[in-house]
Amino acid sequence: MLEYHLARVHQAKLVNSHILATSDTEIDKPIVKFCQLKKQPFFCGSESDVLSRFYHAALQTKATPDDIIVRLTGDCPLISATLIDEAITKHRQGDNSQYTHISLNYFPRGFDVEVFSMASLTKAYQNATKAAEREHVTLYLYTQPDCIIVPVETGQLDWHEFRLCVDESEDLQLATALIGLLGENWLNASPRKICQLLQQHPEIAQINAKIIQRAPH
């Protein structure tokens, strides 16, 4: 699943540095070995303080305060490079202090993209004190009263019912079936193509339909 994720992320045209942030625990050693094998840059940090892990991973890329940071999660094998570029473009058109994200009212979970500045990430790292804010990287950012939240809403309302992230066994079954259906087109399949396939094959969409997403993301 991670290999599918990385391959699709690498299609993004506006990303010039991509680092995988994993934990320093024994259970994630296979991820480290995978990254070493694939020559994929990575950073190992705290298992519970994910905000710290993400912040130090960004530091490893020598990010400056004005640099744009994109947050993705590795449990999204069909993440869209098109949406990554679209979110970055939307962010560039506004204020760099804003929080830009793919709206899950118009897209399935599994296409999640969050965009913010390194300065905003540093502010969160230095000021977030609640356990939930340390566990969920961007929670502090988008819950601040002065946060400007800019959603990307170019999908369709009926797409949000689908679920493309892989947290449960049913999610893996759906992703496997969908990638099999996409065949050789899996690498460049657009969000529209993927969602249309799910609409055309409700038996696949139903595989994980009963799973309730844990919040916050």
Whereabouts are the PLM-identified features?
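N-terminal glycine-rich phosphate-binding loop and ensuing alpha1 helix
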Residues: M1-I27
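Short, structured coil segments at secondary-structure junctions
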Residues: L14, K38-K39, P145
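Conserved acidic residues
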Residues: N16, D67, S97-Q98
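Conserved beta-strand termini and adjacent loop/short-helix elements that scaffold enzyme active sites
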Residues: A21-S23, G45-E47, I102, V152-T154
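Short phosphate-binding loop-to-helix
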Residues: T25-R92
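Conserved core of the sugar-phosphate nucleotidyltransferase
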Residues: L78-F162, E170, A177, K193-H217
